[in-house]
């Protein structure tokens, strides 16, 4: 896996190989000083390793960039921000879940999170949990995959 460094000259990302990638996403896809005004699609396009990346790789990279762009300088996401992201960036998956017990339990666990912040792993588990219980997932399963 590669880390990225922000180029102050042209506001682009360039990749540098790392023999031992960091365990925490401190330098995964976008550095802390990446201007928030740059769209996710432009940030993705600037990552050379993803130019020929698969749809799945780009999907995970997008989630990582959304997390990174929304996180505090310490690389953690406040729970209020996480809830806001569910409502604004993940609304089609979260829609209709508000009255379901599993969704309420998930948000309750988020409220009880002792640190009051989520790291990237916790954020991804949250997204996957909401996805699995989502009504939208049932629609996705019913999409024709052959002609």
UniProtKB/Swiss-Prot annotation:
Signal peptide segment: none
Q: Which regions are flagged for Polar residues bias? A: 25-34
- List the GO terms this entry assigns under cellular component, sorted alphabetically: cilium
- Record's InterPro entries? EF-hand-dom_pair (IPR011992), EH_dom (IPR000261), S-100_dom (IPR034325), S100_Ca-bd_sub (IPR013787)
Q: Write out the GO MF terms.
A: calcium ion binding; calcium-dependent protein binding; transition metal ion binding
Q: Does Lyase show up as a keyword for this record?
A: no
Provide this UniProt record's keywords sorted from A to Z: Cell projection, Cilium
Chief place of localization: other
Q: Does the keyword Ribosomal protein apply?
A: no
The organism's place on the tree of life at top rank = Eukaryota
Location in the cell reads: Cell projection, Cilium
Segments carrying the region annotation (Disordered) are: 14-34
What role is this protein assigned? May be a component of the linker structure that bridges the ciliary membrane and peripheral singlet microtubules.
Additional observations: 'Sentan' means 'tip' in Japanese.
PANTHER family from the xrefs?
Answer: PROTEIN S100-A1-RELATED, S100 CALCIUM-BINDING PROTEIN
Q: What is this protein called?
A: Sentan
Q: Which source organism does the UniProt entry give?
A: Bos taurus (Bovine)
């Amino acid at each position: 896996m590669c880390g990225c460094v922000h180029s102050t000259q042209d506001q682009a990302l360039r990749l540098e190989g790392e023999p031992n990638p960091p365990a925490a996403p401190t330098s995964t896809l976008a550095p802390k000083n990446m201007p928030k005004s740059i769209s996710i699609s432009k940030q993705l396009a600037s990552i050379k390793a993803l130019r020929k990346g698969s749809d799945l790789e780009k999907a995970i990279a997008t989630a990582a960039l959304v997390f990174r762009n929304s996180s505090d300088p310490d690389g953690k996401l406040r729970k209020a921000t996480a809830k806001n992201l569910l409502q604004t960036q993940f609304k089609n998956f979260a829609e209709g879940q508000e009255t379901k017990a599993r969704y309420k339990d998930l948000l309750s666990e988020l409220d009880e999170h002792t640190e009051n912040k989520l790291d990237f792993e916790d954020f991804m588990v949250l997204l996957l949990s909401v996805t699995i219980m989502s009504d939208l997932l049932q629609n996705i399963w019913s999409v024709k995959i052959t002609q």
